[in-house]
Amino acid sequence: MLDEHILKEMKLSFQLTEQRELASGRRKPEKPQHPPAVPKKKVISKVASNPAKISETMIQKAQMESPKKSKKNKTAGAKRPLSNNVSNPDSSPSQKRLKKDNTLPKKNPVNKSSNVAAKKSAATSKSAKLPIPKVHSINELAPKKTKVKTPNKTKEASLSKKHKVNGNKSSMKVVQNGKVVEIIGTAAETSDIEMNSLDDWSEEDDYLIESDSENDVVEEIDETFLKDPKIFKVKCKGPEYKLSDILPPFEHDEYQPLLLDGDGSGTVRKIKVFKSAQEETDSDEDDIDYEPEDSDDFGSEEFDSEESDSEDTSSADYDSDGDFYSEYSDMEDVSDSDSEEFGSDIFDTDDLDSTYEPPDIEGFFDHPPVGMQREPLIIEEIFDDPPVEKKQERIEQSSVMDIVVKNLSSVPPKKESEVAIETEENDEVSLPEVVTPEKENYLQPSDVPFYRNPQANPTELSVFENSLKSNHVLAVIKEDLEVYGTLVLTLLCGQISVNGYRARRQEAITIYSPKGLNWVSISPTKTKKPVKDEVNWEELNKNFTRAQLDRIKTSFQRQTNAIVLLHRNTSAQQLVDTFGKHMAQNVFPLVNSSNRPFGQSETLLHCLIQSSDQSRTLQVPQVWNKLQMHATSRIIVAGGKGVGKSSLLRYLINRNLGQFPSMLLIDLDIGQPEIFVPQTISCTVIDEPLLGPGFLYNRQPEHAIVVGHTNIVLCAEQYARAVIQLVQNIQNDAKYSNIPWLINTMGYNKGFGIELMALLVDRIRPTDLVQIASPIPINNFDSVLDRNSLSQIKPIIYSAEEFKINEIPKYTLHKLISAVPAREKGTWSLSAKDMRYSNLLARLSSCLTGNAKSLTDCQPLGVSLESLKILHPTSKNYSREELIRGMEANVVYLCHHGAGLPQCLGIGVVRAIDYERKELYLVPAMPLQKMSLVDCLILGGEQSLPQGFLRDQGQGVSSSVPFVFILDDSKSSKSIQQIYHRAPAFLGVPANQRN
């Protein structure tokens, strides 16, 4: 008698055999193979020298695993006839491999006798586009098994989980006569795959790659496949094939595939995963992440080894998420600046790590919770070790690869419909690009200009001529262009408009168009009469050849075009380098001349230029042009967060600079100031256009006062005192009386926001108030900001006598709708925290003069501690000694202490403090001419020195700063991220009911 454990092992063996039979499609699931009865005694001889007897069940098992068929099954395994009338005689598998049979599965059974060449020609003529393998939808984890019928309809094969139909795609590979065939279909065409995927293939000829035995596959694939295999690939509707040669796979270990067993798991070389940012959004418009369920670029968690190995996707195609902040991620304060939104009660997106992997839980992404978004990420070489046990099997000396493009340069003929579509596309010249048919129908989320797809939107109409002697580019602008980077533009002839500013001839204007904000647009303006040719061609001939100038003259049309001279913004080189060091995102571009249509011009300019489709630039509503401005205009711009107050301010400044030589910008936003540093309010005379964020110009304000916080809830009274004093200083200065005022306010529209607005209107006495409304209700005030509404406000926070509202003046109320363009899915944008961080980096870059690359390269200024007054911005509970020690290696505000609150002149970095000599060494980020006025230092409060300055101290410093916690892989401004939790009731809408 056999032992009990031996019987258990045998039962387990039969169960595994049955599972393999079902998974490989050799048996129907309806007819399970029952394990044999308990064998009799003496079935297995106890004598080692005598051969063991083989039971009938063992013979049946061997026959099932053998590729040879018994006489009983020969009819079911017979090869499908070449046509309906011609039958193929039975033969063994080895004999069939000697014949050159190019029979391939066809959607139409009549065409099954065509050879490989005919099929290749048909597939090539049908489309010139190369199919690119896609990963399936991640949210559809429930597999759908595809059942395949044999030719005589007597036997059904159930595909393994590898061939599931997941969402938009289903994929399968089959070895046939030394060829590898891959079929890819869409979810909408599942019926085509079910009917035509495997029903034309016999079980003796064609073998699935997913063999359950290593010997089965090796024995049944002939030598032709190992030496010179051919690869086919079938697209969605109907079988189309691409044939090309690949190298012998057994010579390259990295090409050896890892098979998948019944559970669909497998070892992959490169896969796509998703990083979830748990954010609560108020509108679909503000969702900046991908929605993978609508895109073919995203797939399920059940990855096929063939697809994974063949994907040619790099992580560089997607933006790094190391510094990814959404509009809703900044939870530091209730009243932050424009782009900040109320949101995430769980965690800040600053804490997301780029190596995040979703947990391996079934149904994890089936129904994502409200606010849960996904961000694609490429992780390469996840599993380098070969699989063990029964999970996967490795085929030795064999390889499977996807389509290999043999000749990219050869363009097959196109159909008439495709020729008609591409006639318009050929108007623009770009580098050769492989495009899938799905890519022609709609814009993929990854088709974002400049930093996603550098070949997108090339401009052929405009003409660019590069100087051989300098970094100048002479251009004829014929259509709207958008810019990514910074450059200096000089108008030579014609008329152009740059974000509302009409450039004057021979005037050099500086453009800043960083990533994360709307691109700056350069648009030629049509004229009624041809403009005069006032270009100094002789002067241009010093940098350009005669042939180049002749091409410019020939292509220039006087009524519609403009001639401009572009050159690199060398004065901003330190600023660009600082952003490159301390920002994970490429706020300014990394120019690569090899893959851009105008790479040489962009290399000279260190800036990317392309034709604008007006989807990523500022679109000015007509009502904006109806806002009239006079010399005595006092215009307050109010609205919630992210409604476009700064964009409107810059447009009004740019449009009216031709009428007024200068204007006064009063910036009352302590979270996201337009000109000066955060935690301050200021006023600045503007006499040049703001063609980009104002803080990148590093302008010095006329007056500035330190508030000391970015959250007005924590400094409400101090903020009001600072505003009252600043307005009094402006009103007492006669030079500001005859120029227009533009007042930028905070985006704090809840809580006591309307009470604060009433106080501002009472003190400033405006002539106009522009209220910008957002489609997101939470970003709007609870009532209209007219005179009657503000007059009925009963103060609660500002109830003291010094904040008493006397009488609300009369003013004109302009109600506008937000003109902020819809954000593209998956694009990175500057959040409020990013804006403050960028503002600080821009200001600190002004310290780096000459050849200085770090703060340690700058010569500090020494000053006696006895001559300085040391203050804390929001508290008086600290001693002088504590404040002095807190300033070391940190940012401080450089102020002049006079009557009232101290006047802020700029910022600086305390390099060191000599306690024995009582001297302080300072690196100022302000003009040295005003340093003689500094007699007071105020601690930076929340504004600390970015960590990158402590980590990268220059080549002359060999040791780290003592007592400083440094993360080598961090580029953020703080080592420990602060997470703020806000109750959903604060927003007035339950978390599960938000849009």
Swiss-Prot record:
The UniProt regions of compositional bias labelled Acidic residues, in chain numbering, are 279-354
Annotated binding of ATP, by residue = 639-646
TM segment ranges: none
Q: Where in the cell is it found?
A: Nucleus, Nucleolus
Q: Which GO terms describe its biological process?
A: cleavage in ITS2 between 5.8S rRNA and LSU-rRNA of tricistronic rRNA transcript (SSU-rRNA, 5.8S rRNA, LSU-rRNA); rRNA processing
Q: What is its EC number?
A: 2.7.1.-
Q: Which UniProt keywords apply?
A: ATP-binding, Kinase, Nucleotide-binding, Nucleus, rRNA processing, Transferase
Q: Does the keyword rRNA processing apply?
A: yes
UniProt-listed SUPFAM superfamilies: P-loop containing nucleoside triphosphate hydrolases
Q: What does this protein do?
A: Polynucleotide 5'-kinase involved in rRNA processing.
Record-stated family: Belongs to the Clp1 family. NOL9/GRC3 subfamily.
Which protein is depicted? Polynucleotide 5'-hydroxyl-kinase NOL9
Q: What is the lineage of its organism?
A: Eukaryota, Metazoa, Ecdysozoa, Arthropoda, Hexapoda
